[in-house]
Amino acid sequence: MAKISSASCFRAIFLGALIILCLPHPSTGVPLEELERAIAILRVRGRALFANAIITSDLLFDLLSDESLTLFAPTDSMLFDLDMTHSLPFYVSTLRLHSVPLRLSLSGLRSLPNSSSLPTLLPSHRLLLTKHSSSNDSIFLDGVQLLIPGLFDGQHIAVHGLADLLPLTAPSSPNRLVEDSTALAKSPWFLGSRFSPAPEPYFAFMDLSPAESPSVEEVSPSPSWGEGEEDFIVGDEGGPLDGRNNGF
């Protein structure tokens, strides 16, 4: 009788553990809907190529795996020149350099001490935040001015516009090159193409490369979180980040 009880107890524990493992676990990354809104804002505020680059590269999956984000978006013209004049590893490294795995609103950036160091999604590279001593309003990252702060301010994501591209070599260390460019070239994500195999549905859906910009007829002001959300949602069904239609 004792053996039967022990076996039954073991089976109950095993089945309980199996059920727990099979249950869906809540995601710890940024909400998909919030990232959609941020991408929509980038498109109508002169940063469409940065938005295209996010959804047509494996950077999208890196962004979705972080609990919070700050995106520092360069202008379309800057990113277009980069795409035309530099190699694939250099291009992708630059995208990662503009992504910080922390949510930093404008007030959050202003509260940081001068010469603060910010982590990025580019391995072994951090951004140096500096401020002019005469004014707390002028913020620079690796020497590039924060030109349009607060493009998007969500609960998990903040987006700011830059005056230029962030350099892959920090101004204070001109000889410190990015170490992972060669490693990126050997990554199975690329295989001689700008696009990784995983995000191919997004590229097929948009029919755009990062260097192609969709036309924007009207530029809208940046809304605060929760105001006018319906105007900036890419779309729960059929949008570029629609998990059901695009293989999420």
Swiss-Prot record:
The keyword Glycoprotein applies. InterPro entries: FAS1_dom_sf, FAS1_domain, Fasciclin-like_AGP. SMART domains: FAS1. GO terms for cellular component: extracellular region. Keywords: Glycoprotein, Proteoglycan, Secreted, Signal. Belongs to the fasciclin-like AGP family. Glycans are attached at residues 114, 136. It is found in: Secreted. May be a cell surface adhesion protein. Residues 213-248 are annotated as: Disordered. Residues 213-226 have a biased composition (Low complexity). PROSITE patterns: FAS1. Residues 1-29 form the signal peptide. Residues 35-166 form the FAS1 domain. This is Fasciclin-like arabinogalactan protein 19. The gene is FLA19.
